[in-house]
Amino acid sequence: MLYIVDFDETITTYDTIHLLAEAVNKPEEWSVISDKYWQEYLAWREALPHSTTLTSYLPLLGGSRYLEEASIKRIEKSQYFSGLSEGALDNIVQLITLRAGFVEFINALVPDLRVSKTIFHVLSVNWSARVIEQTLLHHTDLTADLLCVHANDFDFDTSTNTTNGRILARNASSLLMNSTDKVREFRRIVQTDAVSSPLNVVYIGDSPTDFGCLQISPISILMRSNQKYYDILSRFEDVQLVDISEFPVQKAVPGKKIIYTCSDWCAIQKAFLA
């Protein structure tokens, strides 16, 4: 089985981006940066036309990339994330809580991961692949050779061993900012690592940045971290939402993509590892 999994609010209980910002401890400066982003994001979202299908909605989501690019350019220009040590980033790990059942699920996979019977990737638009990796290593039985994190990451100045304010792609062909970017990397991962049959590929995510991968993955699971994202998918004519307890569905509705739903990893473990 090949698992490709989102991080924030899929593996974690809450979004972790604010923890990265708080590590710098410049709340007023961060408020200016984040307020500007949300003003632009809300204006973009309000201008989106109504979509009745996921297929028509995904190109609209792809149009958000200019917002994310502008945001990262502002962050880099301000040097907001300059001067962070590896230790400061690693301290964030202690503040991150994982969604119920994840530790048990991933630890149950470890024997198969060690013999490459199962492969585990994290695919995220988060800005710190290091924090993602250290979180998983800290909370679970995973070792660095058993996972691969595809995300953005802070660039380090080798002369000071601190961040230089730039954000780069890690294990990705370019920065990961939106649903379209994640689809690109999803396809690359599958092409490289898919085992025996494409039906062995599972994608798990929770938000619109995951919708593209949820559409194309042979097995797709929506983590119900936010009701509004479930509601968005439920209105699409080409989507069939099914509780994970019904996996595998014996008869799909023609023309509809099955997306399984759950609220924790206990349900996923029961469906796949029981």
From Swiss-Prot:
The record's Gene Ontology cellular component field reads: cytosol; nucleus
Query: What is a GO molecular function of this protein?
Result: hydrolase activity
Query: Keywords of this protein's UniProt record, alphabetized?
Result: Cytoplasm, Nucleus
Its subcellular locations are: Cytoplasm; Nucleus
Gene3D superfamilies in the record, alphabetically?
HAD superfamily/HAD-like
Which family is this sequence assigned to?
A: Belongs to the CTO1 family.
UniProt protein name: CTO1 family protein C17G9.12c
Q: Which species does the entry assign this protein to?
A: Schizosaccharomyces pombe (strain 972 / ATCC 24843)
